[in-house]
Amino acid sequence: MRDIEPKLLDDLTAAPALKWAREWSDATEARLDSSALRKRIRAALDSDDRIPFVTRRGEYLYNFWRDAEHERGLWRRTTLSSFLAEHTDWETLLDVDALAEDEDEDWVYKGATVLPLSWDRALIRLSRGGADAVMVREFDLETRTFVDPAEGGFTIDEAKTNVSWVDRDTILVGTDEGPGTVTNSGYPMQVARWTRGGDKSVIFTGEPDDVAVGAGYDVVDRRTVVTRALDFYTSRTWVDGEFLDVPDDCDAIPHRKWLFIQPRTEFAGVPAGALGVIGLDAFQQGARDFTVLEQDATVESLAFTENALLITCLVDVATSISRVALGTWERTELTLPAAASAHVVAASPLAGDEFWVAASSFTTPTTLLRGDASGALTEAKHAPAHFDTSGLETRQHWVTSADGTRLPYFITGDFSGGPRPTLVGGYGGFEVSLTPAFSNVRGIAWLEQGGFYVQPNLRGGGEFGPEWHSQVVKTNRHKVWEDHKAVLEDVVARGYAAPAQIAIRGGSNGGLLTSGALVQYPECFGAAVIQVPLTDMLRYHTLSAGASWMAEYGDPDNPEERAAIATWSPLHNVRPREEVAYPPALVTTSTRDDRVHPAHARTFALALWRAGQPVDYFENTAGGHAGAADNAQVSRVEALIYLWINDKIGTPLA
């Protein structure tokens, strides 16, 4: 039975909601035999020839690994010489499968914070079912056991927690300690200093309307850095209690004796989106004579080694990485593989001048490169493709949106034939940049079968600096859909596909994109995949972490912003099939998603069904906001989605 009282769907684990979700999910899966595709995807995800990405801590390189025998994963380590050898010998530190079985818990590994310098203790984060909320437990790397709380071991109950080591017996912690300790978004509002065996002492308190408060301890300079996130794009920072007097919309990064800034609007001669640096002491004494390190390209990310700053930039969505010597600011451009996107995957001031870079493209598998003090890169590992890439190429096109803005998109496939089924991704929010990247899953299930894949760079992302994002927030949010529609129309105009051959797909904010497209311009495509979406935008700020996103979407309690949101909120713009026929939609979510509430997906699927529109629904019982918690779940969900797309817009050419 599809019909249900919508309010019942707000309760994550209530019997009526779970029964409704399970029955509809089972019906969706039953219509599609995904076993063969699932098996092939799972084999690629579990393959031993994948690259084990590493992080250096002292003399060891650490890695977390999942495969067919270890579905929940192994936390392990090795030496550099062994890692670079043809066959690597790994030392297992924690077997999460064994732990979950021993404790009868649905544990998902969420990371480890290891005690700097000695590297013999860790604060392990474990999630039930993949949720953002974690339990934190102290782990002894020498005995390979958790430290008993009765013996002074640090243990923090399940919550959205952040932690940082100060020394062997002291940590900084922000967690849910009850009323008055978390923000309206559900994140820590306080930071406390906790000494082993003693009580916590609060050192900083934010405000309920903040997104979060966090702190870290710099073991090199022996100082505490506290950050108060006012919203998603504004924050304030204190170093050992001293406020850094920069604008709220300016990212401030204190490092060693310098202060690096990335302003979203011009500040002290540093242009919006640029990168500036000044002596930290001089700044605190009133100096504002910044040195501009980068202003000609979009700064995508920063990373530090012992003696250098690594700057990753984008120019027309093409990657460059520079190594800049600290203090002299002498710059060396890294030589990256041709036609590849690259990003720094590991670097640390505590790991000398070593750093690691991953490079790939839509058609070229990932290469892992090791860098040194000279900026030279040496190949360490190279992953093979698990699908046939012959005949595939990528093109970049530019289109004009409704307000005249030009934006690019990539299209990948075999261009030797005519129009064919085309899958269009997209995100368009939160300053997230979409760059070319290799995916065995997409290759196996789509590209190898003859389909085109389109990746648009919509406004709202970070590909072209702060203004590329700020142009489409709050009352201008509709422009994201104008960009998306322009891309779909261009794909058709260039002869790549007819509208009925196009499927759109997006998750999270991308699920808002595709659900909004479904109700705004359904004539432009033939199917929509809507994953872990936001759809109920008139009350999103009251669900899970929704209050933290009001700087992006607007405040539904503000009359002007509410009026704007109401024009595009997907749930509130569903129309009956007698008025307009929507293409088929597949709506997916996870019961354990504690970031975007499953009610967004549940109520939207219900609204489509009640309107007589074609809709399928699938809810994974685990997985958190990622939608899947292990390779078995990923292969299950991905196979279902791709077979559903094939069923709706036609199987690509063999």
Report residues per predicted region.
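Long hydrophobic segments that form regular secondary structure
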Residues: 205-271, 280-284, 580-582, 587-613, ...
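Solenoidal tandem-repeat scaffolds enriched in leucines and small polar residues
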Residues: 164, 169-239
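Cap/lid segment of the alpha/beta-hydrolase catalytic domain
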Residues: 98-115, 126-131, 145, 150-152, ...
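Active-site-proximal cap/loop segments of hydrolase catalytic domains
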Residues: 456-654
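Non-catalytic accessory segments flanking enzyme active sites
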Residues: 15-114, 125, 189, 212-229, ...
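Blade-edge beta-strand/turn elements of extracellular beta-propeller
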Residues: 90, 141-156, 197-208, 238-243, ...
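Asp-box/WD-like beta-propeller blade repeats and closely related beta-sheet repeat scaffolds
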Residues: 89-111, 123-126, 130-170, 174-185, ...
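Beta-propeller blade signature
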Residues: 76-80, 137-142, 187-197, 238-240, ...
